[in-house]
Curated annotation (Swiss-Prot):
This is Thymidine kinase. It comes from Clostridium tetani (strain Massachusetts / E88). Zn(2+) binds at residues 145, 148, 183, 186. The lineage of its organism: Bacteria, Bacillati, Bacillota, Clostridia, Eubacteriales. GO terms for molecular function: ATP binding; thymidine kinase activity; zinc ion binding. Its EC number is 2.7.1.21.
C-alpha cells in the first residue's frame, strides 16, 4: 500500500460495525507518524459516540481528529505540507466527499477512508460505494456474527432488542445498544 512519494492514492477500509475499521485507520495513522509524515485526521461531527474530537475504536484505541460538518471543510482545513489525510466514518458525509477525496489524491496525497459499506438494511451506505469504486486499495474487513459465530459482513440494527424495520431511518448513531454484527444468514430486516 505504499507507492512513490508525491503520488496520491485512495485507500478504503470497509465492512460492518465491530469489524475493526476505526482500529485499522488508527493503526495506519500511527505508522504514518512513525514514518515522520504529516497527517491530518477528520471525522463527521455526527459521530460523537465515544468522543467529539477523537476517532475511537470500539476497543478503546483513539487518535485525535477534527470534527467537521461537510466534506468541503476538509479541503479548507488541509495544510499544504500534509502528506496523508485520514477520514473516519466516511459514509456519513455528503455527496461532495467523492470529489474531495479525488482532489486530495490528485494533489499527490495519500487518502485513507474508513466507513460502513452497507447500512442496516444490507444496502449500499451513502457515498461509500462511490469512494470504493475510485480507490486504488480496498480492504474489506469482517466481524464475528453475534448469532452463529461465522464471519459477519452486515450490521444488524436493534430497537428494544428486535430487528429494526426496513423503513426506519438509515442514520442512527449508536453502538452496542442498537447494533450488532451479523452474517448474511442471520441478518434480519422485517419489511413491516
Amino acid at each position: 500500500m505504499y507507492g512513490p512519494k508525491n503520488h496520491g492514492w485512495i485507500e478504503v477500509i470497509t465492512g460492518p460495525m465491530y469489524s475493526g475499521k476505526s482500529e485499522e485507520l488508527i493503526r495506519r495513522v500511527r505508522r504514518v507518524k512513525i514514518a515522520k509524515q504529516k497527517v491530518q485526521v477528520f471525522k463527521p461531527e455526527i459521530d460523537n459516540r465515544y468522543s467529539n474530537e477523537d476517532v475511537v475504536s470500539h476497543c478503546g484505541d483513539k487518535e485525535g481528529a477534527v470534527p467537521i460538518k461537510s466534506s468541503e471543510d476538509i479541503l479548507k482545513l488541509i495544510k499544504e505540507d500534509t502528506e496523508v489525510v485520514a477520514i473516519d466514518e466516511a459514509q456519513f458525509f455528503d455527496k461532495g466527499i467523492l470529489e474531495v477525496v479525488n482532489k486530495i489524491a490528485n494533489e499527490g496525497k495519500r487518502v485513507i477512508c474508513a466507513g460502513l459499506d452497507q447500512d442496516f438494511k444490507g444496502e449500499p451506505f451513502g457515498y461509500m460505494p462511490d469512494i470504493i469504486a475510485v480507490a486504488e486499495f480496498v480492504h474489506k474487513v469482517q466481524a464475528v456474527c453475534m448469532i452463529c459465530g461465522n464471519p459477519a459482513t452486515r450490521t444488524q440494527r436493534l430497537i428494544n432488542g428486535k430487528p429494526a424495520k426496513y423503513d426506519d431511518p438509515v442514520v442512527l448513531v449508536g453502538a452496542k445498544e442498537s447494533y450488532e454484527a451479523r452474517c448474511r444468514k442471520c441478518h434480519i430486516v422485517p419489511k413491516e
